[in-house]
Amino acid sequence: MKIITWNINGWRAIWQKGLPHFVERYQPDLLGLQEIKINNELATAWSDKLPGYNIFWHGAWRPGYGGTAIIAKQNLTNLRVTNGLGNDLFDREGRCQISELPDFYWLNIYFPNAGHELERLDYKQSFNKYLRQFVAN
C-alpha cells in the first residue's frame, strides 16, 4: 500500500500546479493533505475531479484556514474515514481525519503551529496532549 502525506498550503493553488498529474504519476492508495484552506461546502465541487478516487473532506469552520483531506483509491471498499477527534475545540479547525482499514488505522493530522510570538503555544500543547490520550485509548 502506498501512502503519501503532504502539507499543500491551499487546495486551489495545488490543483492548478498539478495535483491531478501528481496523483496520476504516483497513484497513491491514500493521500493525506493538510492545510487545504477550503471549507466543506466549497469542497464538494471538487469531489468528482479525480477519476478512480474518492475525496474525504474535513474543512475548517472558516474559509481559507486549515483543514485536511484524504484522497483514497475507490477500490479501497473497506475504508472508513472519520473526521475529528471528538473535541470541537480542535475539530472545528479540521485538524484530524482517521482512516480505518482492516489491518491498521492511519491518522491524517494538521498539527497546530505555536505562532511566531508563541501566541498559540497553549493551544498546540493542548492539542498534542489530547491527541496522545486519544491514540492511547
Annotated model-derived regions:
Residues I36-A114:
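Structured beta-strand-rich core segments of catalytic domains in phosphoester-bond hydrolases
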Residues W11-I14, I38-E41, E117:
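Active-site environment of divalent metal-dependent phosphoester hydrolases
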Residues L121-N137:
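A long, amphipathic alpha-helix that forms part
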Residues W6-A13, L85, Y123-Q125:
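Short, flexible loop segments at the rims of nucleotide/cofactor-binding pockets, characterized by
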Residues A114-R120:
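Metal-dependent phosphoester/phosphodiester hydrolase catalytic core
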Residues I3-N7, V23-E41, W106, V135-N137:
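Active-site beta-strand/loop signature of hydrolases that rely on acidic residues for catalysis
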Residues R12-R25:
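Short, acidic/polar
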